[in-house]
Amino acid sequence: MTRPPVTDWSTDFDHLDPRWVENPYPIWDELREKCPVAHTERFRGVYFPSRYEDVRAVAYDTENFSSRRIIVRETPPPRIPAPPITSDPPEHRPAKNLLLPAFTPDAIKQHEQPTRDICARLIDRFAGKPGCDAAIDYAQEIPVRVIAVMLGLPESEGDRFRKWIHEILEAGITRPDILMKAMGETSAYFQAEIDKRKSEPRDDLITQLSRATIDGQPITEDHLLGALRLILIAGIDTTWSAIGSCFWHLAQHPEDRRRLVNDPALIPTAVEEFLRAYAPVTMAREVIKDVEIGGCPFKTGEMVLLSFPAANRDPRMFPDADRVVIDRKENRHAAFGLGIHRCIGSNLARMEITVALQEWLKRIPEFHLDPAARVTWSEGTVRGPRKLPVLLG
């Protein structure tokens, strides 16, 4: 379906507009100076704060903004819980505490070598060839496999998981039928896996969460299915998008790439800068009480597009915000969110991104964009390259 063209980004923005999808940064820069809190009647009314302080204010305000709807969609579906990301206080804290043990630094350390092995096997497939798609052949494969192992699922299910992610996070924004079909399929899939573990428990996250309790009571089936769906979707798409954006940058900036090849110790610092500059995740909040943020009134019932990527490009917060400085010293970016919903998987994501870069640069120090092919980007909640054709060597 053809979408009506945007007439004015301040009063009629559309985050699915091809210009926004392809290169949102100039649009955000313009809004930050001209209209720091934009509004559109599309999607039944949405606000877009573009300054760090306003994004932060909304993220921390759980009295006036709810997380029960975290994606701006054309037609709001029935409420689909995915605790803790869709939970408000007081339910949020116990739901988050259930997942935290699996994502501590010590817990993630155990997954580092298996992640290196995954990266090495993937690189074996295209090392020595003239080129590859750094998104499809590499970035999109890593988190799928890592999360599958954590959940106790076959790595071979990757295509199925990628299909669901596309349907839920992209196609489902404007097609509620596609969304609800995918949600039903994920629920049925996870229910079957839960049933298997009742008779054959395993050392995996599905088994652990199946036994979880809150205040001494087993969590509900809806809670369990929602939490597993969250781990699958949020644990895969966000990280592969971040990894892909790193390679998109390095394929165009040989000076940065060579610095990292010559000084691998700089990679973790560079990862933080890539996360700042190319943060993948934009969340949403629902206005539940009339309130004013940044001098702009927010009306009950409308949505807020909570863009951590836009906040990370605010020059009031980050000097040279539009420059990628891979050895940036002070970098309090918001790539993993702000407030109570800050991403619990940040340790895992950082590890995967760092390992993905280390293993690739060790074996493929030279690569650049394929001038005969086109980079394409995802649209909607998570931004990252969907296709990233590169030439090797």
Per-region residue spans from a language model:
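Cytochrome P450
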Residues: 1-393
